[in-house]
Amino acid sequence: MPDNRQPRNRQPRIRSGNEPRSAPAMEPDGRGAWAHSRAALDRLEKLLRCSRCTNILREPVCLGGCEHIFCSNCVSDCIGTGCPVCYTPAWIQDLKINRQLDSMIQLCSKLRNLLHDNELSDLKEDKPRKSLFNDAGNKKNSIKMWFSPRSKKVRYVVSKASVQTQPAIKKDASAQQDSYEFVSPSPPADVSERAKKASARSGKKQKKKTLAEINQKWNLEAEKEDGEFDSKEESKQKLVSFCSQPSVISSPQINGEIDLLASGSLTESECFGSLTEVSLPLAEQIESPDTKSRNEVVTPEKVCKNYLTSKKSLPLENNGKRGHHNRLSSPISKRCRTSILSTSGDFVKQTVPSENIPLPECSSPPSCKRKVGGTSGRKNSNMSDEFISLSPGTPPSTLSSSSYRRVMSSPSAMKLLPNMAVKRNHRGETLLHIASIKGDIPSVEYLLQNGSDPNVKDHAGWTPLHEACNHGHLKVVELLLQHKALVNTTGYQNDSPLHDAAKNGHVDIVKLLLSYGASRNAVNIFGLRPVDYTDDESMKSLLLLPEKNESSSASHCSVMNTGQRRDGPLVLIGSGLSSEQQKMLSELAVILKAKKYTEFDSTVTHVVVPGDAVQSTLKCMLGILNGCWILKFEWVKACLRRKVCEQEEKYEIPEGPRRSRLNREQLLPKLFDGCYFYLWGTFKHHPKDNLIKLVTAGGGQILSRKPKPDSDVTQTINTVAYHARPDSDQRFCTQYIIYEDLCNYHPERVRQGKVWKAPSSWFIDCVMSFELLPLDS
């Protein structure tokens, strides 16, 4: 092989045609140290450019039909149509954000800061992200919104505006034929007056006004003579559209507030003007009109009608959900995470009541919403503009603004906050989930202070604490733990927050979790502890320390206030009670405004037994497996004496029922999680149907075929039973053959690897004590 390391003053020899072309030498980008590295970084950044705007990619997305990669803002007008470069058709659900490429761009930004000693990079990682539709400066009309005060309906339409900017407006007379400016010198109070006049003639067809009349009404000539507006004056934008490219003009605004609840119907221009620069990327009712519909003027009545009939929603962008099956090694890509759609823009207060618009964006505090449509729409028909809804594009900096505090101090706004805070996207994520993923500390703090549940789980089982530990947001983890987040709760595949922190090497978070009582010996579905996922010696030294006071840690994790436990309705049921005791229980249900069932249901919260010991009835066992309160009948008497709901702890049956309740409050897996049962033979003492109900209620699964102990497929299953003792071989046994032991026939003993035979009495004892008891010979 030829030596390519030649001095610069020596001419390279002629390359043979059979030899491969050598790589070009890196030319230094400048003088000084790291010149070759800077040159290589420049070449890398040339490859990381958008295929449309040729700038460095920001939130890179792929339309799915081709290999071109764009900035998310550059293709907001191409969603659902096709690639703007090769014109390949692309479905809207194929839109994907390349999180790995985005991480590479952030690393390039850090490297450039190191090489150039520049702290102000345009790729700075901490710069707030922009969503797919929030570029209000470059694409002011990307989203149109219509609102009807009568029907209380809102519709959003995505405009397919051209990427090319329009030419500047000429001041000569000939330019007036192409573009027009309509400036209103009147204060915003006139808008409400015009809206009232418009409502009186909403049923009549409005006459078309000539251009001269409109110019005269809007006082265009006078404004041009007076000159430009004062740049210091706050202004809002009004949009008057005569064609597919509407003109945007400005008019004064008072206190930066926008009121849309003027009585009567609003004209198209007023609706547009009051709702500019409001970005709602996650709205369910988003349509992309075709070319024909863009050239026609749509009235609010027509829009509201279409809104009622149209139920097609825009699929939510893959906003950082971990994959349920493919778990990679990197902390972000292991859960198939992609960036979150975020909103930005100026702080706008609007009074648009919309129920079908989820707001799973947490880069900003949530907005208070009113429910509309159906009964709630009729009840709120007389609502005034004091019901304020914050824009989802509110940046965290507005948390301390006076206008924000004024809005959130209103009782109506705070009353509607919980309904909005529990909104979920199609992955089951709440606002708190996404704020924890993004590390948005102001939004997390705001949501927690206003009653958001820190222990809510998404469809995969992840809590906000899991997400914060996975992404390494130490401050978010601290906030969640301070607001009673459960430190040992399990997520997908029974991973605890400590598992996530250990996998990704977040030592500070591991220390914080351990200080709050995180269990070092917690195992996931594969039987692996947090220490099994790390190679770092310092982290191993933390995770290998013995748990000195495990009982206190468990009690620390199980602390939940009474109000949090009693959020839901009380559902009472009695087991083994006499007729007189049943009457007293019915009286208590009336006093406490609770429900009383005769058959067990998954909604039951309290099971009342006559004595001090729990009975092996089906109701009691189902109550134990579901984590219900198993109470003595003295609790009913105490509640009847004081006419209030007494504290349950003093009247709770100890041992198994208490362990079951604490297990449920800590959101831990059920008793038979990871176990499979085959019911062999006939059952007389406990019918087979009852055993099936118990297995299902305990999180186990029923096998339709008898497992074979000598089967390689059976023995190679790598899952474990969560509640089995970690120091016994029973933890690896996941398949049980249950038989009736009260009869004279006893089958041969099987205890081979994953398959064990066990009597039905052992199964019942496990339920009553809520633990997997040792299986004696």
Curated annotation (Swiss-Prot):
Q: Name one GO cellular component term.
A: nuclear speck
Q: Where is the composition biased (Basic residues)?
A: 197-209
Effect on the protein of changing Q564H: In an ovarian clear cell adenocarcinoma
Question: Which region ranges are annotated with the description Interaction with BRCA1?
Answer: 26-119
Gene Ontology terms for molecular function: histone H2AK127 ubiquitin ligase activity; histone H2AK129 ubiquitin ligase activity; kinase binding; protein heterodimerization activity; protein homodimerization activity; RNA binding; ubiquitin-modified histone reader activity; ubiquitin-protein transferase activity
- At what sequence positions does the UniProt record place the cross-link Glycyl lysine isopeptide (Lys-Gly) (interchain with G-Cter in SUMO2)? K160, K170, K423, K548
**Where is the BRCT domain positioned along the sequence?**
560-653, 667-777
Q: Where in the cell is it found?
A: Nucleus
Q: Which SMART domains match?
A: ANK, BRCT
Give, as residue ranges, the zinc fingers classified RING-type: 50-87
The record describes its post-translational modification as:
Processed during apoptosis. The homodimer is more susceptible to proteolytic cleavage than the BARD1/BRCA1 heterodimer.
Query: Annotated region Disordered: where?
Result: 1-32, 167-211, 356-404
What are the recorded Gene Ontology BP terms?
Answer: cellular response to ionizing radiation; chromatin remodeling; DNA damage response; DNA repair; DNA strand resection involved in replication fork processing; homologous recombination; mitotic G2/M transition checkpoint; negative regulation of apoptotic process
Name recorded for this polypeptide: BRCA1-associated RING domain protein 1
Naturally occurring in which organism (per UniProt): Homo sapiens
Taxonomic lineage of the native organism: Eukaryota, Metazoa, Chordata, Craniata, Vertebrata
The gene coding this protein: BARD1
